[in-house]
Amino acid sequence: MKVLMFGWEFPPHILGGLGTASYGITKGLAAQGDMDITLCLPNPHGDEDHSFLNIIPMNNVPVVWHDVNREYVEQRIGHRMSPDLYYDLRNHIYADFNYRYTDDLGCINFSGRYPDNLNEEINNYSIVAGVVARQQQFDIIHAHDWLTYPAGIHAKQVSGKPLVIHVHATDFDRSRGHVNPTVYGIEKDGMDHADCIMCVSETVINHYHQSPDKCFAVHNAVYPLEPGKEEIIAHRLPLKERKERVVTFLGRITMQKGPEYFVEAAALVLQRTRHIRFCMAGSGDMMNAMIELAARRGITDRFHFPGFMKGNQVYEAYCKSDVYVMPSVSEPFGISPLEAMQCGVPSIISKQSG
């Protein structure tokens, strides 16, 4: 079976759990043996693992015809996409997009992140998806999270192929109920057009009025530890050799994750004992507010903000921790507690997490 998949991030360049989940899903599908996966990403770097899938960099897909020679195409984008694919995609431009800002190859640029003009990038991504869907041969479409639902819908309209959307979370989870109408509309539209809705838990579609017949819970998991990570865990100090205890929060420092509860709990604990350090690893829109909150509570001497972590850094942080805490206000199915448990670290999670 040939799968045309739309994603937003992918290791080693990840910004959160979506990239990690996308990697695990694609690798698991590829292991089935009869799957041919083509993953579309807004702005891949070229160093992603291509061993089990094909990657199309959407920022190298032309939407405006430019007469460019092969040598120049090879020089500009050869490390990410073959010139043959570029020219084949160029032959499938389906409309006049000269009103769009494009580069010297006729391509739309993407940040590959979550910029202020995210809605514009999502719309542009769906435009490019129309070119890809006309050029590629595939049996089914798989769209990851709301960012790629419009692309998945467009690909379905072009090809007539079934659409599977993967709901990793909804705006109800991310916003504590203060739903962005635009985001909700995109999510609802994606679910309405989908032939199958994959959810990480059964609760994420309650507000979207979907038929249970097309909704399936597909829970997250983690892969067995790689040798490099096993070596990190092997050097974890026994509890009796540790002078201080470390309690860790690791994730996006944003409303959904409940970071203020972690800071407030730390302040309460430190009223009883000072032999504990608290680590809030990650980044997000509430990071500065949490630094200020820790300062107001007078606990900055026992509180650390190491910033965003990835790869082995994550496992090094777990192995220096005695307890992992995930105080999420809403968490469909967090991966980080599973990673912590792999390292032998006890996890405390909120009851509404998964």
Residue ranges of predicted features:
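Conserved donor-binding/catalytic core segment of Leloir-type glycosyltransferases
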Residues: 198, 240-266
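Short alpha-helical donor nucleotide-sugar binding micro-motif in glycosyltransferases
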Residues: 308-309, 316-321
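Short hydrophobic beta-strand element within catalytic cores of glycosyltransferases
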Residues: 346-349
